[in-house]
Amino acid sequence: WARTIDELRSDYPLDLLLKLRKMARSVFYYHLKRLKTIDKYSNEKESIKLIFHEHKGRYGYRRVTAEMHNRGFMLNHKTIQRLMGDLGLKSKIRMVRYRSYKGEVGKIAPNIIDRDFTAEAPNRKWATDVTQIKIGSVKLYLSPILDMFNGEIISYNISRKPDMEQIYDMLDKAFTRFDSLDGLILHSDQGWQYQHYGYRKRLEEHHIVQSMSRKGNCLDNAMAENFFGIMKSELLYTENFESPEAFIKALDKYIEYYNNKRIKARLKGKSPVQYRTLSITG
């Protein structure tokens, strides 16, 4: 009622409005002050809602805070958390463990990366892996390459068969993007695909150094496995896909989103592409 009275007071005497409502002047001003205090974050709340829905509920208060900073709203994370609570906004994402597709394992290359997933520039260190995705009764296999510099998906292939054609397609897509990859390290687990002569030959032709995790040690390829966990939590487990084709279409959009819009704390609140661009342009 305080808001309504405040809106009507330009046309009617305040005393009359308070008398009709049987409200004391002190009570009116108390509620009016409280309303104005609450409303001082009205613009911020609109931006929070926009960010939250733009990212389909995938962002918790920490990422919302970082994105708010990117948009010029310099509120701390506690305030953002409180405002999100007031708006009833809560991230629907809960990270889950996953199991990647390994096949037979064996080692033909040393573990050069040795859990050092940092890189000083793009295209110094890449990681790859294969994960299985089940849509109804159909199994799909996703094989991406990630840049350790910024976590960007360089290329990927999704197929119904985890065969070498999938791996070759993924490599070819990556190789055509760059003039030279001399000295790049490409890290993987000990999956059979990465032991294959054809895989090793293609790396050799492009002067790429092969690195392999230790047997049965998922932490040695944590960067690729972390991406799979994020993708499955934010995409696969949040929607019911009617067909493998529907999932593949959604995956294409998700990877575009992941590279260009999804911000990361380790990238100083930037998306992978934004971070790479800034590293080049300064």
Language-model features, listed with the residues they occupy:
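Residue-centric detector for conserved, function-critical "anchor" positions
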Residues: 1-12, 16, 22, 38-39, ...
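C-terminal domain-tail junction helix/linker
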Residues: 204-208, 230-282
